[in-house]
Amino acid sequence: MERVVITGMGVVSPIGNDIKTFWNNLIKGESGIVNIDTFDVTNHKTKIAGIVQDFDADEVLGKKEARRLDRFSQFALAAAEQAWSDSKLDLDRIDVERLGVYVGSGIGGIETLIENVDAFRQKGPRRVSPTLVPAIMSNAAAAQISIKWNAMGPSMSPVSACAIGNTAIGEAFRLIRYGEADVIFAGGTESAIIDLSIASFGNATALSTRNDNPTKASRPFDENRDGFVMSEGAGILILESLSHALRREAKIYAEVIGYGASSDAHHIVATHPEGKGAYLAMRSALKNANISPEEVDVISAHATSTKVGDISETMAIKQLFGKQAYQIPVTANKSMLGHMLGAAGGVEAIALAMSLKEGIVPPTINLENPDPLCDLDYVPSVARQVKINIGLSNSFGFGGHNAAIVLKKYE
């Protein structure tokens, strides 16, 4: 079996639209949560979100290309371009039939859909864009990446809600591991901060209503947490077989060594209260990596800042790691990023790869009064320098989808 490594990364996020800015802000504990100013929030319970700043699609992609794409595909292409450039791969020197794309989105082009529904209702069918369907479909981002890079290998857009990023990375890892591809773009993207989705999540009482202090709203594991903060962006990684990477003397961020997935089989939106599915995904990932729980040095938690979710993930970690759970730093990137939905797993995998490379665990901010049922070491407030060899990253989604990946420091 082939070993699989990460040779390029690209990010679009509320705390930075390149790896350097993103990482520096993450380890400084900078929050990307702001007041929503893209639509009227007067009648909404939640008025805050993690919004990507200073992103000019026309400048990044060109006006013609940007105009026909929904924002979620724009984010994906921008992140993919960064990752490709970072990897130093040369299309003329690789087999494009073994170049794949595994990139998904949880919601797809909802903004474009709503714009066209409004146009249809107000002005009739002639005002509906002929590019509506290819713009809104969840596989649009993967398709656009495939087209741009002439990637003729395996292509897929997994749809596992907020577990998408890890699902995409894990399935791409499997393909390369078993020799069916040399290089794959893998990750997730999302742009769904519109009035309809904020209203829906808000009415489901899933969102934080801490509108008076946005940067304090996302507070995983804190007793005063009151829901997640919706966010947006994209995280794309270049996965490559080690043999392929070594032949071209590529820079390597980290090695992907394990992947596990499971289903809660419990409820369409609520996580299993005892974290059973989360436990199974983590256990499967460690088994797949052929490592013991004692070998894990850091955990990147899903940790969305919901009452039940944070407790159930803590329970799952303690069930799998036993007493060792109290010795492992557990970081919650969503305390700064908010919940990027389908983009979360890809972005958090990038953060974990950087942690392995730099030996720094990002902090969990806003953890001022820990929930008594959340009693692990969550790296509160300040980043920590730690010797890290192996890291585990969790992503869980509506429908009970769970995916965990294991990364290892490459030496």
Please report, for each region that a protein language model flagged, where it lies by residue.
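ACP-dependent fatty acid/polyketide chain-elongation machinery
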Residues: M1-E65, S243-E255, I350-T364, K408-E411
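Condensing-enzyme catalytic core mediating Claisen C-C bond formation in acyl metabolism
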Residues: R3-T7, V34, D212-A289, D297-V298
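Conserved beta-ketoacyl condensing-enzyme motif
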Residues: I6, E30-S160, T189-S200, P293-G309
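Conserved small-residue
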Residues: G8, L26, A80, V101, ...
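A glycine- and small-aliphatic-rich helix-loop capping segment at beta-alpha/alpha-beta transitions
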Residues: K20-I27, E111-P125, L175-Y178, I198-N211, ...
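Active-site-proximal alpha-helical scaffold in enzymes
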Residues: A76-L89, A141, S146-E190, F228-A250, ...
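Glycine-/small-residue-rich "gating" segment that lines the acyl/pantetheine channel
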Residues: K123-S129, T167-G170, R174, S191-R247, ...
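Acyl-CoA/ACP chain-elongation machinery
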Residues: E180-D226, Y259-P273, A303-D310, Q327-D377
